[in-house]
Amino acid sequence: MSVAAGGPAGAAIPESRLMALGIIGGLGGIYASTVNPVIGPVFASLGAVCAIIWGADAIRRVASYGLGTGVPSIGYMSVSIGIVGVVAGLASVFTLPALAAPVVGLILAMILGVVVAVLGKKIVKMKIPILEKCTAEISGAAALSVLGFSAAIAGSYTMQAVLTSVIATGFIGLLFILNTMAIQHPFNACLGPNENQTRTLKLAASTGFISMAIAGLLGIGLNPGWWLVSLVGALCWVVAFKSFVSASFEEAASVKWSGLWPKEEEQ
């Protein structure tokens, strides 16, 4: 059971597949951001959603070793690490080809995630066996999701474009909050004895797509494809959220929309 401090419940989708989805989908979307001024930002945003789903699953695995109180903490910490990795990766253009920037950002974020996790185990004495692996994954997912949405806003993943359209405008602060909530909220909302991976990841898709819709609005005046990003994000959010609600109804013992639950003797 996921809140029994003994690790996550069974997984319908192997973590290796979700990692592949996050890394391949995330990087693919980022690199495709420049193929077309209108379609490119949509690809970048979809890549960010792939990374968010990967990160949400990693949160699910690592946070299942406690009562769930550390879900927001590791979420904010890991997205901070991811942003540091992204900025450092973008800055690598001074020594490496611009094409390498997203990969460098991902690698740096994951390395920093491992370092922070090791410090957490050695100094804070956190007894979570998969802390290093999951912190690295969440940090990497955060890096790709932030860079994906940044590319969607700026229309490109290059340092100059992101610096001008995302960092200088202050949108990077909003992306920090937005991506943290998108990654950590699914398990935070679904945790409990009956939590399961499928329902949690349906909510992760929902939070990812609503974040995509918001990222599209941030691109108003910055790229011509902002409206399509918001439209696709909003439509996909409706589908994902309806799927999550349906799954919740199917697995609930009963549903009550308002008022107090009846006492046992009144049933």
UniProtKB/Swiss-Prot annotation:
It is a multi-pass membrane protein. The keyword Membrane applies. GO terms for molecular function: tetrahydromethanopterin S-methyltransferase activity. Pathway: One-carbon metabolism; methanogenesis from CO(2); methyl-coenzyme M from 5,10-methylene-5,6,7,8-tetrahydromethanopterin: step 2/2. GO terms for cellular component: plasma membrane. InterPro entries: THM_MeTrfase_su_C. The keyword Chloroplast does not apply. It is found in: Cell membrane. The chain crosses the membrane at residues 18-38, 39-59, 76-96, 99-119, 138-158, 163-183, 209-229, 230-250. It catalyses: 5-methyl-5,6,7,8-tetrahydromethanopterin + coenzyme M + 2 Na(+)(in) = 5,6,7,8-tetrahydromethanopterin + methyl-coenzyme M + 2 Na(+)(out). Belongs to the MtrC family. This is Tetrahydromethanopterin S-methyltransferase subunit C. It comes from Methanothermobacter thermautotrophicus (strain ATCC 29096 / DSM 1053 / JCM 10044 / NBRC 100330 / Delta H).
